[in-house]
Amino acid sequence: MNKKLILCAAFLVAAVANTFACTNLIVGKNASADGSTIVSYSADSYGLFGELYHYPAATYKKGTLLDVYEWDTGKYLGKIEQARQTYNVIGNMNEFQVTIGETTFGGRPELADSTGIIDYGSLIYIGLQRSRTAREAIKIMTDLVQQLSLIHISE
């Protein structure tokens, strides 16, 4: 009995331990009462207060550069080539219903690349602005990481 009580107490402590990950709630059409698909995202950080971002669709001239700022801090990271066409994004979903959430966490410091000019937040929103499908978003984001190096250690 004591072993079960101790194990249960340890589990409860672990369950409520302080973490710095974000939260996603995803409900598929077969799990909702009316067949709706529901996606919710929260940046569970004390410094991020859940703004609803909007990036309007646009067409750009060839050679246009995009300033990249770190999503968490607003720190300028560098410039990348802008796509010729971008799509409307509100929150974490674009006009084609491509939706991206994240649940990041602390990572190993030796994996950080101080020369990187893209962070996870920029990847999310650039991926959404440039993609019509989830597969396309994944390709765009992985190509950007390969070309520019990811500045964060955990994502």
Feature-to-residue mapping (PLM):
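Short, charged, surface-exposed loops that flank catalytic or proteolytic processing sites
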Residues: 130-138
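N-terminal secretory signal peptides that target proteins for export/translocation
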Residues: 1-2
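Second-shell loop/turn segments in exported
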Residues: 113, 122-131
